[in-house]
Amino acid sequence: MISTEKLSLQFGSRVLFENVDIKFTPGNCYGLIGANGAGKSTFLKCLAGEQEPTSGKVVIGKGQRLSVLRQDHFAYDEVETLTAVLMGHERLYRVMKERDAIYAKPDFSDEDGARAAELEGEFGELNGWNAESEAATLLSALSIPVERHTKLVKELDDGEKVRVLLAQALFGAPDILLLDEPTNHLDVDSILWLENFLYDFKNTVIVVSHDRHFLDKVCSHVADVDFQKVTLFSGNYSFWYESSQLALRQRQDSNKKKEDKIKELKAFVQRFSANASKSRQASSRKSQLEKITLDDIKPSSRKYPYVVFDTQRELGREVLFCEGLKKTLDGVVLFEDVGFSMARGEKIALAGSDVATSALISILSGETKPDAGELRWGRTVNLGYFPKDNDPYFNTQLNLIDWMRQFSENKEENFVRSFLGRMLFSGDETKKSASVLSGGEKVRCMLARLMLADPNVLLLDGPTNHLDLESITALNNGLLKFPGSLIVSSHDVQFVDSLVTRVIELGHTADGKPKLYDLHMTYEQYLADEARLARWGLAKKP
């Protein structure tokens, strides 16, 4: 168990949260949610002991082991991958090191023997005999193959390094598990595995995530950071969202009725207060008026962008036709003989390795050329492309208004500013350099650029990356209303499943040859499809 007592934190005059009394109990998974900048990650750091609060304290149950998903993979550069995972259980790793050091001594004394016996007992109590196999299982489940377990962490790519740190946090069944964005750099199947792992986890989990499907699957409670408080709700994210929206509408409706009643009473009092025959009634109405109080509806720190894709030109019947497409990268065939067509209004998800799906979307956009094959877009197509890597677009000192002007025929500042405003850029924010934007800000700028183009076909590669829950919800709602055609690649299961009715997988045959699978089904159905699981060597989820 972990709890807080009168926990407060502020930086200068800015209060993130104050007097937070909250208890997180075993057997529950708590989704820590809130707008960007509300203090979610900072609250998590307070719980982990990495951030000193302004006042109050964090209380951890006696003998409880707390594990945190760390971000400092450079600290393990010179460590073997499997060993880095074992280091997640500090006490066990310390016992293992001392035990190995004693057994490695050339002159083994009686004192060494006594100490070794103590360590063997502690090693057994900590399930040390199964430690390496458990660590290896975690790594394999997170898509790090066995042959890489003995490599130094510095030899892994950045995505693998992050997954090693996740395995490290999960290792050894900690009593309290703190996870900040654990699904980052995970493929869809690793995310689904993590969902099942946390669903079955018996101890306390507190997690920050922008993945709604993930939060819905793993969370028994939601802890909402808003209004400088941390408020606990039972239920998963969707239940919290629906109930909080309902409660807000009810308070707003109640206030509207009260405001109407106030107007009615004021009008009566003003009209008849000087009328002798009506003075008693006017006095009664005045008394009623004084008793009516409006609910104090505080403005939330949450802000939702306004995402809508207007299509100025209607699509014809022919949207896209391609055949025989092939792409090779560093001598590896990503895909070959890829051919399919897309109809007006059709919404398609691309599945497969990230490298392959990004390569195909880049080819479809015209940004790169295929090694073989051809593709043809319909004459009425106005294409909008969202690349996964948007950094090249922001390698400039232009401010945001001038950055947007590059993509607009209408150069008037008010026109360009209106699109930035839709994506929550206002005032002086529009004057800052495009080169200093955060990942989420860059994505919002790219979406503003897309809206400016009035596309009737969208190619989206990882559009929810770096976005907060509010922006993802706004984008999702905007795409649900989009009448054009769509091809999307994303690890956000709920986002994709809500949009598509067809999945094109850049997969492979049993003997490893690239093959396209064109499947008319929802994304959830695709993920559970037994044939897909068999192709990728995955066990069917219970």
Please tell me what each predicted stretch does.
Residues 113, 186-187, 283-294:
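Extended non-transmembrane interhelical loops and adjacent amphipathic helices
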Residues 130, 277-281, 291-301:
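Proline-centered turn/helix-capping motifs that create local helix->coil transitions or kinks
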Residues 1-253, 308-542:
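ABC ATP-binding cassette signature C-motif
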Residues 251-265, 269-271, 278-287, 303, ...:
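ABC ATPase nucleotide-binding domains
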Residues 103, 241, 270-273, 277, ...:
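A structural signal for long alpha-helical coiled-coils and helix-turn connectors
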